[in-house]
Curated annotation (Swiss-Prot):
Superkingdom: Eukaryota
PROSITE patterns xrefs: TUB_1
Signal peptide annotation: none
Cysteine-cysteine disulfides: none
Domain F-box: 50-105
Tissue occurrence: Ubiquitous.
UniProt-recorded name of the protein: Tubby-like F-box protein 6
Alphabetical list of CDD domains matching this protein: F-box_AtTLP-like
Organism listed in the record: Oryza sativa subsp. japonica
Family under the similarity heading: Belongs to the TUB family.
Source species taxonomy: Eukaryota, Viridiplantae, Streptophyta, Embryophyta, Tracheophyta
Length: 403
């Protein structure tokens, strides 16, 4: 019997026990006379949860560990998420078992999209662009193909304003408004499209300072937890330099990662890691459920002191080489990019960060075109899927002063 069948059988069994217990309490009265007991939905849910919680912790942990190890990738990975939704005890053990992407190389819960990518290897994703609606959708690949059906991760919508352009990023592909409970941040450009700022809707580290931008506002109390300040927390600044060759030449870009210290790419370094969403409305989004405790936590290794005193990590685009026979600028994307485009880039740690030559050669983020309105996005530690997606969105924007 598969683990999935086992879980389903156990769930059905405990569900029938709970229903039988409720019927007995509702129809059994003194002297055999039927009576109606005051059993509400909350009590029924509590009784059913107690049945699940009565499993021996050692047995439960062993079962959940095997499920986590066997269901390594989507769509079967959803079984791990389902286990976290059974009851409180199952949720606690599942969250202990599931490791962050930095160590496991897996995306399980929505918070994984705010956590640094794997140290060993990359997470291979792709972006679909809809020109008509000016929307962008990020997926993680399910196969070795450059693009497949994919597992949806994030969505963004382009919003033009008189002096700037915003890209609103959401966990929900059908609702990309800033007032939505699934809104997690945005990318904002200046009028010329040469400078961009990535804003996180949640504190990226302990002590993060919210931007005093006029656009920063607190949405309805029914959408935002009153314990957590809502606003724009700058996590990255992206700049594109003037291109003397115009549209024919490669772009030059720099990314200052405000929330990541330089030491993150050095031996023994650590990048800030969000562990929970502070918004009460982010309990779930399509195909993935998320569960939070009463407070939002940040990894203790990424305190305000360590982040503010250290220099910020700087990423720069890897310089392409001119191919005389092809008459174009080339980068080695290792087969992940197939169409020449000025949007294509690879980001590495800048030499001003002082990393070793080996670390400096590692491509942290690469983005490139593979078809009409279809692009690959591969990222790794120390940046997250959210940060990577926002940086890639900046490549789509028109750059008046650079080209």
């Amino acid at each position: 019997m598969s683990f999935r069948s086992l879980i389903q059988e156990m769930r059905d069994e405990f569900g029938s026990i709970s229903r039988h217990s409720l019927r007995s309490r509702s129809h059994r009265g003194g002297g055999g006379a039927p009576r109606v007991a005051a059993v509400g939905p909350a009590e029924a849910a509590a009784m059913q949860q107690s049945c699940w919680a009565q499993l021996p912790p050692e047995l439960l942990r062993e079962v959940l560990v095997r499920i986590e190890e066997s269901e390594v990738w989507w769509p079967s990975r959803r079984d791990v998420v389902a286990c976290a939704g059974v009851c409180r005890s199952w949720r606690g053990i599942t969250k202990e078992i599931v490791r962050v992407p930095e160590a496991s190389g897996k995306l399980t819960f929505p918070i994984s999209l705010k956590q640094p990518g794997p140290r060993d290897g990359t997470l291979k994703c792709f972006i679909r662009r809809n020109r008509t609606t000016q929307t962008y959708y990020l997926y993680i690949g399910l196969t070795e193909a450059l693009a497949d059906d994919g597992k949806f991760l994030l969505a963004a919508r382009k919003c033009r304003k008189p002096t700037c352009t915003d890209y609103l990023i959401s966990l929900d592909m059908s609702d990309m408004s800033k007032g939505s409970n699934t809104y997690i941040g945005k990318l904002r450009s200046n009028f010329l499209g040469t400078k961009f700022t990535v804003y996180d809707a949640h504190p990226p580290y302990d002590g993060a300072v919210v931007s005093k931008s006029r656009s920063a506002r607190v949405v309805g109390l029914n959408q935002v937890s009153p314990r957590v300040p809502a606003g724009n927390y700058p996590v990255s600044h992206i700049s594109y330099e003037l291109n003397v060759l115009g549209a024919r030449g490669p772009r030059r870009m720099n990314c200052i990662m405000d929330s990541i210290p330089t030491s993150a790419v050095q031996e023994g370094g650590k990048a800030p890691t969000q562990t929970e969403f502070p918004l009460s409305g982010l309990d779930s989004f399509p195909s993935i459920s998320f569960f939070r405790s009463k407070s939002a936590r940040i990894d203790s290794a990424t305190s305000q002191l360590s982040t503010q005193k250290e220099e910020k990590l700087v990423l720069k685009n890897k310089s392409p080489r001119w191919h005389e026979q092809l008459q174009c600028w080339c980068l080695n994307f290792r087969g992940r990019v197939t169409v020449a485009s000025v949007k294509n880039f690879q980001l590495v740690a800048s030499d001003e960060n002082g990393p070793t030559n080996q670390e400096q050669d590692k491509v942290i983020l690469q983005f490139g075109k593979i078809g009409k309105d279809l692009f690959t996005m591969d990222y790794r530690y120390p940046i997250s899927a959210f940060q990577s997606f926002a940086i890639c969105l900046s490549s789509f924007d028109t750059k008046i002063a650079c080209e």
